[in-house]
A protein has these predicted regions:
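The feature captures the beta-strand-to-loop junction immediately N-terminal to the Walker
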Residues: 41-43
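Conserved ABC ATPase "signature" region
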Residues: 96, 100, 107-125
Length: 245
């Protein structure tokens, strides 16, 4: 892998919550390249949310480190599973508010807001209070707020939960477009078909340990063993083996 294209490198991350007997993460590695989408997979309680919190700097690992290879740290934006907007404000007012938190000129803030609105197809909802928008529009608003930062790395945590198929397809297409224009994506989800559609690599965790990591096509091929029919069969193979071990 060319170090010049690496956006973020996490090496041997270990994190243990106070009062817990076992670490939530145990020696997790990840190298994210520019314009690469990595699916972050694992059962509930596998360590996905903890891993994301370390990448965001919300928690500090007890060992291991996170580094970047460029001249300056990458801009990281987060789309949480929970709604990250003010429900009593309109979509436009939410975008105005979050853009105002960035160190931008008025002209640049207006430009980014306009780009986010058009990118996430919020034009007809811009003056509607967020609480009265559908689940799909609310998810699009979540993404639009993150895109105001023009991120180098976008962390998405279950971004399509509770939306209809049309809204899900739109969100997936938008993420795919971002990757194709050079944005790196870490995509945490339980929906295997979404990962298969937009991610070239995966990181599969369980009980804080890496069960599988790397190029998705290579992992599905079985690396000399019987190939897996799809990502779900690969997931079940590794997580069930973890239970047996």
């Amino acid at each position: 892998m060319n170090a010049a294209t690496e956006v973020l490198v996490a090496e041997q991350l270990v994190y243990q919550y106070p009062g817990q007997d076992e670490p939530a993460l145990c020696g997790v590695d990840l190298k994210l390249q520019r314009g690469q989408a990595v699916g972050l997979l694992g059962p509930n309680g596998s360590g996905k949310s903890t891993f994301i919190s370390l990448l965001l700097g919300l928690r500090t690992p007890q060992s291991g480190h996170i580094r970047h290879t460029g001249d300056k740290p990458p801009v990281i934006a987060w789309v949480p599973q929970e709604y990250a907007f003010y429900p009593e404000l309109t979509c436009q007012e939410n975008l105005d508010l979050f853009a105002g938190m960035l160190v931008l000129s008025n002209a640049e803030a207006s430009r980014r807001i306009e780009v986010a609105i058009h990118s996430c197809m919020l034009q007809e909802f811009s003056h509607r209070r967020a609480r009265y928008c559908s689940g799909g529009v609310q998810r699009r608003l979540n993404l639009a707020i993150a895109l105001l930062q023009q991120p180098d790395l976008l962390l998405l945590d279950e971004p399509t939960v509770g939306v209809d198929p049309q809204s899900r397809a739109f969100l997936l297409d938008r993420v795919h477009d971002l990757v194709s224009t050079g944005t790196s994506v870490l995509y945490a989800t339980h929906y295997m078909e979404e990962v298969s559609k937009i991610c070239s690599h995966i990181l599969l965790l369980d009980h804080g340990k890496v069960l599988a990591s790397g190029d998705l096509k290579s992992l599905l091929s079985g690396s000399g063993f019987t190939p897996f029919e799809n990502l779900e069969s690969l997931f079940m193979h590794h997580t069930q083996r973890q239970l047996r071990d």
